[in-house]
UniProtKB/Swiss-Prot annotation:
Main localisation: secreted
Known role: Probable oxidoreductase that may be involved in pollen tube growth.
Protein name, as recorded: L-ascorbate oxidase homolog
Transmembrane segments: none
Entry superkingdom: Eukaryota
Annotated localization: Secreted, Extracellular space
Entry EC no(s): 1.10.3.-
Reported induction: Expression regulated by the haploid gametophyte itself.
Annotated organism of origin: Nicotiana tabacum
Family matches, as SUPFAM superfamilies: Cupredoxins (SSF49503)
Length: 554
């Protein structure tokens, strides 16, 4: 063969390898509209995606590229966030008011992101206004690649279950209440996949199982404020995954699931073939709320028993029970996640802490209106997304960094309304302590990262409490609960450049200021660390019409 032919063949081989090596793309077109729904039997305006509530399920595989073209047919600006997706180098697609201009009514926007080096159970939902109270949410499941071993046999099927509290008031009414300075109060009920039912009501089954087979149930709590407890009538649950981590496979009769959290369990259909109830009940509310759904055996005979499994205790005893359950959630050190190497090959407990950030939540009246905040700052969104302001070098016109200190002020209950942006040094390993001095539970989520949940304890934190940390097999996750009059500790490396939202997952509190943004800048301004602004990214506010900055280079 001549040298020219050899060169040509070699070039073809290189090109074919390049094509094969690119990860697959999945494309979705979503039409976001209003529609009448009645989760608790009261007709109200809901937010539908392609006519569905809950919305369409995204089923993908680790490293897939996801392309979602969203058409906003509402009468208000709208955004989706992809809760738990890390968006490596790409906070442009995170879908929060601090990173993106909203999709205006009658307009569309195409999200493009990669589920890089992730597996697990996640969700998407609206971040604008109080839209989450009207629906607009759904599942985002990331499966392991074919060559990566999974620490359990393939289930017969997978089912996504969205649970949480619900309000009969519409999202615009709820927003008006908050804008008027009042709380939205107690929810009206609990829903399961957009519906509710009581024992004895004739309802279609939520899911069907075949006797002798095992099923994977992916649960997410996308309510507004209430923790819930999940239990199957007559069927124990084997916990196998929580927010992207394979867990030690303990067996549970019931599981607490806090707002914003997702987990996976295996349930085996090994009982008498008939109907059984899935029970979801509220936690830590003065007046308990609950709902049931029917799980039916194929070819089964007989209704579900009216005798429901006993819920866990409430009040102080219930908090201790739930805290102990948290401690039982541990990382499966020998299992692989998105990569072939075992999860336990990352020894987070041996890394030196470079910074400790203590965060106190509080509530207060500001100008006669209810506000929530962190370390004395109640966050407010400006007219321009923070990421755009920073990228265009216009921060002096929009916000000041580090108004919030790493320690709580002497009187954290005194709140100042301001844009809350903290600098974080790229690739530093940090410890974040959450202290909750309130009488109600909190849950917090950090975009762009998974962190190690090393402790949840009663009382107040002090450096001596580090001896209680789990430095070996704490779960890598993206959401942490903080019980009343308790604290929680997480550890992470700020190795993902971008602008990332730390927020309460209880949307009333988020809307009224209980959130902040971490600015994580790479000093090299290199494409190795962060992507340039996408070509289709809309500009708004003070950066609209400005010349584009010099792009990052490889």
């Amino acid at each position: 063969m001549g040298s020219g032919k050899v060169t040509f063949v070699a070039l073809l081989l290189c090109l074919s390898v390049g094509v094969i090596a690119e990860d697959p793309y999945l494309y979705f077109n979503w039409n976001v509209t209003y529609g009448t729904i009645a989760p608790l039997g009261v007709p109200q305006q809901g937010i539908l995606i392609n006519g569905q509530f809950p919305g369409p399920r995204i089923n993908c595989t680790s490293n897939n590229n996801i392309v979602v073209n969203v058409f906003n047919n509402l009468d208000e600006p709208f955004l989706f966030t992809w809760n738990g997706v890390q968006h490596r180098k790409n906070s442009w697609q995170d879908g929060t008011p601090g990173t993106m201009c909203p999709i205006m009514p009658g307009q569309n926007f195409t999200y493009r992101f990669q589920v890089k080096d992730q597996i697990g159970s996640y969700s998407y939902f609206p971040t604008t206004a109080l839209h989450r109270a009207a629906g607009g949410y759904g599942a985002l499941n990331v499966h392991s690649r074919a060559l990566i071993p999974v620490p359990f046999d393939n289930p017969a099927d997978e089912y996504n279950v969205f649970v949480g509290d619900w309000y009969n008031k519409g999202h615009k009414t709820l927003k008006k209440i908050l804008d008027g300075g009042r709380t939205i109060g107690r929810p009206d009920g609990i829903i399961i996949n957009g519906k509710s039912a009581k024992v004895g009501e004739a309802k279609e089954p939520l899911f069907t199982m075949e006797a002798g087979k095992t099923y994977r149930y992916r649960f997410c709590n996308l309510g507004m404020r209430s923790s819930v407890n999940i239990r199957f009538q007559g069927h124990p649950m084997k916990l196998v995954e929580l927010e992207g981590s394979h867990t030690v496979q303990n067996i549970y009769d019931s599981l607490d699931l806090h707002v914003g959290q997702c987990l996976s369990v295996l349930v085996t259909a090994d009982q008498e073939p008939k109907d059984y109830y899935l029970v979801v009940s509220s936690r830590f509310l003065k007046q308990a709320l609950s709902s049931v759904a029917i799980i039916r055996y194929a070819n089964g005979k007989g209704p579900a028993s009216p005798e429901l499994p006993t819920p866990p205790p409430e009040n102080t005893e219930g908090i201790a029970w739930s805290m102990n359950q948290f401690r039982s959630f541990r990382w499966n050190l020998t299992a692989s996640a998105a990569r072939p190497n075992p999860q336990g090959s990352y020894h987070y407990g041996q890394i030196n802490i470079t910074r400790t950030i203590k965060i106190f939540n509080s509530m207060s009246q500001v100008g006669g209106k209810l506000r929530y905040g962190l370390n004395g700052i109640s966050h407010t969104n400006g007219e321009t997304p923070l990421k755009l302001v920073e990228y265009f070098g216009a921060t002096n016109k929009a916000f000041k960094y580090d108004l919030m200190a790493d320690e709580a002020p002497a009187d954290p209950s005194k709140l100042t309304i301001a844009t809350n942006v903290k600098n974080a040094t790229y690739r530093n390993f940090v410890e974040i302590i959450f202290e909750n001095h309130e009488k109600t539970i909190r849950t917090y989520h950090l975009d762009g990262y998974s962190f190690f949940a090393v402790a949840v304890e009663p009382g107040r934190w002090s450096p001596e409490k580090r001896k209680n940390y789990n430095l070996v097999d704490g779960l890598s996750r993206n959401n942490i609960q903080v019980y009343p009059n308790s604290w929680a500790a997480i550890m992470l490396t700020f190795d993902n450049a971008g602008m990332w939202n730390l927020r309460s997952e209880m949307w009333e509190k988020t809307y009224l200021g209980e959130q902040l943004y971490f600015s994580v800048l790479s000093p090299s301004r290199s494409l190795r660390d962060e992507y340039n602004i996408p070509d289709n990214h809309p500009l708004c506010g003070i950066v609209k019409g400005l010349s584009m900055p010099a792009p990052y280079k490889a």
